[in-house]
Amino acid sequence: MSIEDLARANVRALTPYQSARRLGGKGDVWLNANEFPTAVAFQLTAQTMNRYPEPQPKAVIESYARYADVKPEQVLVSRGADEGIELLIRAFCEPGKDALLYCPPTYGMYSVSAETIGVECRTVPTLADWQLDLPGIEAQLDGVKVVFVCSPNNPTGQIIDPQSIRDLLEMTRDKAIVVADEAYIEFCPQATLAGWLSDYPHLVVVRTLSKAFALAGLRCGFTLANAEVINVLLKVIAPYPLSTPVADIAAQALSAEGIAAMRQRVAQILDERRYLVEQLRGIACVEQVFDSEANYVLARITASSAVFKSLWDQGIILRDQNKQPSLSGCLRITIGTRAESQRVIDALTAENV
């Protein structure tokens, strides 16, 4: 018997999530993971590495609650938003009995987290405009405990219609948890659902410091929900999810100065996004550039697989979306620096396809 034979059957059948770093590449223009393009400097101030950290660091919780305009008891901090996603599935879905539902094309970790735990995944593809198919969702809800909605959606970049989400919340009341994945909400803060928590006890919002806060390497995320949901999650989260250095830097990022700096970064990214979109729309091999509310754009490219490989060979690493439902011919491009955008523009302009 091999070691793999000892593993759970569902784990043996798993295909790991193909993260940007797992896919690799040897480029010098990294535009495939929706990271901020330059590093932000922080200095460690905590000098208590000999002690275990707080289970839920008070300074981080209170700072994030203030930033998100919620109560501290409505905030859980975790190792990235991905841990928050997994905690919700573990806490609310019974393997072999319950299901979760999501609407592709969207973020891939919902299914990976569910399959790892042994929870059934149901998919209801979005409509032609990438909005929710509410009748399709309603038809699949029996036995569903958690529904994931990503807004702005990754990789398409659009905001999900708020009225559709309200309809979904009414449809699932007393039946299922609805999770709004707001990893990119800093780029369109007017679209947040955090203010809806008082109206919908089954609404959960997941957030991160990885994008606009430029801290993807920190691995720090947040779950916003009513206290009853947070108390359930506290039963299954690891005792010390955030190390002392992570909590230290997160608290600095959430200070008044840190938030002001984040908003300056957002303004920079929005300017660069406008420039990139304008330039892409004038390139022969670019068939369509979709509107985006996030720090990336999705474009349909002639001979996209060949173009993707050509740019890869030039050290420009984009994200191929061809395998996602309804995204044939599409590449996702993270908004980088002006110099990085220009590399992409010049390379695409030179393509003869």
From Swiss-Prot:
EC numbers on record: 2.6.1.9
UniProt KW Cell wall biogenesis/degradation keyword: no
CC cofactor: pyridoxal 5'-phosphate
Keyword Amino-acid biosynthesis attributed: yes
Enzyme class, spelled out: transferase
Pathway: Amino-acid biosynthesis; L-histidine biosynthesis; L-histidine from 5-phospho-alpha-D-ribose 1-diphosphate: step 7/9
Catalyzed chemical reaction(s): L-histidinol phosphate + 2-oxoglutarate = 3-(imidazol-4-yl)-2-oxopropyl phosphate + L-glutamate
Molecular function GO labels: histidinol-phosphate transaminase activity; pyridoxal phosphate binding
Residues with the N6-(pyridoxal phosphate)lysine modification: K211
A single BP term in Gene Ontology: L-histidine biosynthetic process
Entry keyword set: Amino-acid biosynthesis, Aminotransferase, Histidine biosynthesis, Pyridoxal phosphate, Transferase
Family indicated by similarity: Belongs to the class-II pyridoxal-phosphate-dependent aminotransferase family. Histidinol-phosphate aminotransferase subfamily.
PANTHER family cross-referenced by the UniProt entry: HISTIDINOL-PHOSPHATE AMINOTRANSFERASE (PTHR42885:SF2), HISTIDINOL-PHOSPHATE AMINOTRANSFERASE-RELATED (PTHR42885)
Subunit structure: Homodimer.
Record protein name field: Histidinol-phosphate aminotransferase
